[in-house]
Amino acid sequence: MNIHTGEIQLVPYKEKYKEVIQTFTLPSEQVQFTSDPGELLEKAKSDRTKNVIVILDYNGVPVGLFALQTGDRVQEFTDNQDALLLTSFSINHNRQRKGYSKKSLALLQEFVLRYFPMKNEVVLAVNEKNIPAQNLYEKVGFQDQGFRRMGPIGQQIIMHLPIIK
């Protein structure tokens, strides 16, 4: 079952979306902060802990994607054994500035309750320099609880979204 607002929906990745996702581009200022969508699909093939989620527009066309990761890697970001790690969030460059990021993240609670009912939190790491992403995550309910870690290109803020059952 898909989670949707009428305008967008979140769905688990299927091969039928691959061709469109591989055409995604990102502006240069965003590339440093997230994974290339094609690379994410490749990594997820060999890593069963990376659950790729596709963001579809109202026509069912992929406009973005992200991963919800389970397993040991999550514990690098939180002590919560029942948390998921959100990684590799991106919206195709030519579909940005249309509200897809905010709308898709607003569906995250419902998606996690449906597909990961035993999980009670989503965590993510956002670079301190990536102010637009920090603001977006705060708007949809993620909280900065003061945890920091060093990432590949600098200090990262660990943000937490409690999943309310």
Where are each of the predicted segments found?
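Conserved beta-strand-loop-alpha-helix junction that forms the acyl-donor binding cleft
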Residues: 118-134, 150-155, 162-163
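Solvent-exposed beta-strand sheet faces enriched in polar/charged residues
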Residues: 69, 123-125, 145
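Conserved acetyl-CoA pyrophosphate-binding loop and the N-cap/start of the following alpha-helix
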Residues: 95, 99-107
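Acetyl-CoA-dependent GNAT
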Residues: 3-7, 12-88, 92-94, 111, ...
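Active-site acidic-Proline motif in GNAT/NAT acetyltransferases
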Residues: 92-94, 98, 128-129
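Conserved active-site alpha-helix within GNAT-family acetyltransferase domains
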Residues: 102, 128-146
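Conserved beta-strand segments that form the floor/walls of ligand-binding pockets within enzyme
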Residues: 85, 90, 123-125, 158
